A protein has these predicted regions:
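Generic recognition of short, well-ordered alpha-helical segments
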Residues: 3, 51, 149-152
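Metallo-beta-lactamase
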Residues: 14-16, 50-186
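A generic local structural motif
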Residues: 1-4, 23-28, 46-49, 82-85, ...
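Short, low-complexity, polar/charged sequence segments that are solvent-exposed and flexible
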Residues: 10-12, 35-38, 57-60, 115-118, ...
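Active-site metal-binding motif and surrounding structural segment of the metallo-beta-lactamase
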Residues: 22-68, 136
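Pre-active-site segment of Zn-dependent metallo-hydrolases
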Residues: 1-37
């Protein structure tokens, strides 16, 4: 599955979000300004966060409830025993960063959608994200979506999430009764 890191450059410095320890990416991120911290948005996204934070001499903030002194608002996505996730909203830049609940890789979107809800969350998508109209939607798996498409893609993914489960469930009986195709060459 595609893993994506983000560097959010503010006037004070750079925040690394769920970074992967790839030297070229870390160098590029730190070239944007003084590193201020590493933010881990999903409890399972341990990745290389601790090692990067230690190497850069900055704090590691794991699924923070708030980020005082930063331009970011923290949005709770899910708080359960096995899934703790928050998202970041940067109002000045109209940037929404979501670690896992939304993605653009080939596993999450349905049909021609740019963005999809994580399959486990499709019945209970993070609807509180509907109130946001991002100019930039950054995800933990896949490429970001920018411009007007970001808000449209976000709202479509959230709006179609439950319907996608219904479509899948409705197709199960047909797939169960469908005869398997023969392998090439008979047999």
């Amino acid at each position: 599955m595609t893993r994506t890191s983000h560097a959010l450059a503010t006037s004070e410095g750079v925040w690394l979000v769920d970074p992967v320890d790839w030297p070229a990416a870390i160098d590029r991120a730190t070239s944007l300004g003084t590193p201020l911290g590493v933010i881990q948005l999903l409890d399972r996204h341990n990745r290389d966060n601790a090692a990067i934070a230690e190497r850069l001499g900055v704090p590691l903030l794991v699924v923070p409830e708030s980020l005082p002194g930063t331009p970011f608002d923290v949005i709770e996505i899910k708080r359960a025993k096995r899934w703790r996730e928050v998202a970041l909203w940067w109002p000045e830049q109209r940037t929404l960063v979501v670690a896992e609940a939304l993605a653009t890789n080939r596993f999450f979107p349905i049909g021609d959608d740019l963005v999809g809800v994580h399959p486990v969350l499709r019945l209970t998508p993070p609807r509180r994200l509907r109130t946001y109209e991002p100019e930039h939607l950054l995800v933990g798996h896949g490429e970001g979506v920018h411009g007007r498409d970001a808000t449209v893609a976000l709202h479509e993914a959230l709006g179609r999430s439950r319907l996608s489960v219904v479509r899948w469930a409705a197709s199960v009986p047909f797939r169960m009764w469908r005869k398997p195709t023969r392998p090439p060459g008979g047999g």
